[in-house]
Regions:
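Hydrophobic packing and interface segments
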Residues: 1-733
Length: 733
């Protein structure tokens, strides 16, 4: 079923891609500056593209194996929909394409931002922010284009006459969910690989350059400087983009599947269709309003950090207010039942995103007390810096967790008509809250991608000796970027929590389809009741599979899910440690063997450091990524559906809290160091500074590798469970 209002969705995605192209061409018209600026930028660009090429080779080999597996399951054993292998490939392809285009833009934008900062602060902000907007608009444009393409395709190819009319939309939405696994798999490799790369280079550059040799950050004498700048792009542009692409698509697809399920029992295809299309329309209008917000961002010369933050906030807040108002109009025009309260669920999602962002800023910005206390602890040595940072990270989990808890309850109650027994509509409300949170992704991701562009611009200005005034401007842009990056991580974690919950609910729908595919038509309960599977509700399946805390299989799954979060963090932290060790050895070797590096008479071998980070990341990212894919499959085969539900609950709850803790502790350590570098507590080179450098070095893999990767672990385990639902139903012990 497709009505005229549906076509707004593909049109909005094309509009996003058109504006992304416009901003890219606008950026490319700017001058890159001096020959040295161009040369430094080309080093970073070549390193970034070299890394991405290697990463995509590894990912391609994993995709080949998984596509063969899915094809056997679909065409050999018939426990999966035949569209799954193709859907999986398109999800991975578009996610990879979004990362590639975003990173390509970022590597061209850094020198142009530095050169624009020679003119004015506002000029530098405009170039960096609109280059970041390319990433934001490419992600939402490709994501919504992929979703609308699959809806149109499946609507055309899945026959009406062979199925109950309401069952057709259930098949379409659950099949579309599977391309989310392709996006999730690609995102995990991008996040883990990019995180290991960037932190191996960063830790190596800091330990030997700052601590041992006493040279400043981004100094061209440091052999790991280029690798460090490359890492900003592969981790914070390609990695963040793939992460949020996955959340964006996952939230829309899960909500569409929940909408189809909520109205199956009504027998009305029209009501079902409206619930399926609503999240897509909200996302489509969000794209248009994000573009308006992007044009609203501008600032004055000599602006302070708070004024720069306000400039970005004007854009994001304008988009958020407009989407809040528009949502009610969309749902009313669409003719949704209970349209006002479902609209309130969308507002809840927006508010949860804002609260998590503000809480993250409070705990990680040097403008506020928590980070300043961590900075002050540097006066008594590195041990107290580590202790205070860990304490801050643990305390910082309270507000995000409470925000998500309140958001879940409110969105459930609003959509269900304040009836806790109306589980189908309540879960739809949680899904639509996740869509609401991500509806302004076009501009919120622009502020995230802006960070590494500004960071690289500062590095370029430092290496090219552009003068104090230019460095002052790039430092201001860089400081703003650090805050937006920390806030962006909080936003990504919060969106992962709500999306993960929506995916968990969608898993039950996939179980329903798996049973029907096996020829099962009726659920026979122990009390003698029987219900048609096609008409069974979420609650019916919970009772049928005995998903209660008294079931040992559920408890076993919960413990395994909690363990997975910590194992995953342990593997990625150790991976950074090993890769950083190789980088430290290489930087020390160059300082020792290449005479004249420290005096500036000889050029370091930048390419060798880039190569070490690339190889380290490729080698180390495979084990944690494969573990995340295998865990739900094995749990399903051994403990069945109940065990998988427990695994997803344990992974979601533990992973969310652990991710907030790691991201905020790492962000606080980073900005505590920067606070001292501004001249506080003795300034650069003091004992307090050296202590906070140690804290920052420990915090690097916290905030840029393990913490952000947990977002994807939460969603990927749910996606794998959904795709493998047929296997679990057919062959579990």
């Amino acid at each position: 079923m497709i009505t005229s209002i549906f076509w707004i969705i593909p049109l909005a995605s094309v509009l996003a891609l058109a504006f992304a192209w416009f901003f890219f061409r606008q950026m490319m018209k700017e001058s890159e500056g001096t020959e040295l600026m161009k040369k430094i930028a080309s080093f970073v660009r070549e390193g970034a593209m070299s890394y991405l090429k290697q990463q995509y080779k590894v990912v391609a080999s994993v995709f080949v194996v998984l596509v063969i597996l899915f094809s056997i399951m679909a065409y050999g054993f018939h426990v999966q929909n035949e569209w799954v292998p193709i859907a999986f490939l398109t999800g991975g392809f578009f996610s990879g394409l979004a990362g590639f285009l975003g990173m390509k833009t970022a590597t061209y934008a850094s020198a142009r931002t530095a050169n624009a900062a020679r003119t004015s602060l506002n000029k530098g902000l405009q170039v960096a922010f609109r280059s970041g907007a390319v990433m934001g608009l490419v992600v939402v444009g490709l994501g919504l284009l992929d979703i609308s393409f699959w809806y149109i395709l499946l609507n055309a190819f899945i026959p009406d006459e062979a199925l109950d009319p309401t069952h057709k939309l259930t098949i379409i939405t659950t099949t579309m969910l599977t391309f989310g696994m392709g996006a999730s798999t690609q995102a995990l490799f991008a996040r883990v690989g990019g995180g290991i790369y960037t932190k191996a280079a960063d830790v190596g550059a800091d330990l030997v350059g700052k601590v041992e040799a006493g040279i400043p950050e981004d100094d061209p004498r440091n052999p790991a400087t280029i690798a460090d700048n490359v890492g900003d792009n592969v981790g914070d542009v390609a990695g963040m983009g793939a992460d949020l692409y996955e959340s964006y698509c996952g939230s829309i697809l899960a909500t569409a599947a929940l909408g189809a399920a909520a109205f199956v029992s009504s027998g009305s295809v029209e009501l079902q269709y409206k619930a399926v299309v609503a999240p897509m329309l909200i996302a489509a209008v969000g794209i248009i309003l994000s573009i308006i917000g992007i044009f609203a961002v501008r600032t004055n010369e000599n602006a302070t950090i708070k004024q720069l933050l306000k400039a970005l906030a004007i854009g994001t807040n304008l988009s958020s207010v407009l989407i809040a108002i528009s949502t009610f109009g969309i749902l009313y025009v669409l003719g949704m039942e209970n349209w006002f309260w479902i609209g309130c669920s969308v507002i809840v999602g927006l508010l949860v995103g804002i609260v998590i962002g503000q809480a993250t800023e409070y705990y990680t910005s040097q403008s506020y007390k928590p980070t300043r206390l961590v900075s002050e602890s540097g006066l008594t040595g590195p041990a107290t810096v580590i202790i205070s940072g860990l304490g801050l990270g643990m305390l910082s989990t309270a507000i995000p967790v409470l925000a998500v808890v309140v958001g879940i309850i409110c969105s459930f109650l609003f959509a269900s008509g304040f009836d806790f027994t109306n589980v189908g509509m309540g879960l739809y409300g949680i899904g639509i809250a996740a869509v609401g949170m991500l509806s302004t992704l076009g501009i919120t991701l622009a502020t995230d991608a802006y960070g590494p562009i500004a960071d690289n611009a500062g590095g370029n200005a430092e290496m090219c000796n552009l003068g104090k005034e230019v460095r002052k401007r790039t430092d201001a842009l860089d400081s703003l970027g650090n805050t937006t990056a920390a806030t962006g991580k909080g936003f990504a974690i919060g969106s992962a929590a709500l999306t993960g919950l929506a995916l968990l609910a969608s898993y039950v729908e996939e179980i329903k389809i798996g049973l029907l595919r096996l020829g099962e038509n009726v659920l026979n309960f122990t009390d003698g009741r029987s219900i048609e599977i096609s008409k069974a509700s979420f609650s019916d399946f919970m009772v049928y599979y005995d998903v209660t805390l008294m079931n040992p299989k559920v408890l076993a799954g919960m413990f395994l899910g909690s363990m997975m979060a910590f194992m995953f963090c342990g593997l990625t932290m150790n991976a950074v440690g090993r890769a950083a060790g190789h980088m430290v050895e290489e930087v020390r070797r160059q300082f020792k063997e290449i005479k004249g590096i420290l005096t500036g008479e000889a050029q370091p071998d930048y390419a060798r450091c880039v190569e070490i980070s690339t190889k380290g990341a490729q080698h180390e990212m495979v084990l944690p990524s494969v573990l995340a894919i295998i865990a739900p499959i094995l749990t399903g085969l051994i403990f069945g559906v109940t065990g998988v539900v427990g695994l997803l609950i344990g992974g979601l709850s533990t992973g969310f809290v652990l991710a907030v803790f790691m991201a905020n502790a790492g962000g606080a350590w980073d900005n505590a160091k920067k606070f001292i570098e501004e001249g506080n507590h003795g300034g650069k080179g003091s004992e307090a500074h050296k202590a906070t450098v140690v804290g920052d070095t420990v915090g690097d893999p916290f905030k840029d590798t393990s913490g952000p990767s947990l977002n994807i672990l939460i969603k990927l385990m749910s996606m794998v469970a959904i795709v493998m639902a047929g296997l679990t139903v057919a062959w579990s012990l």
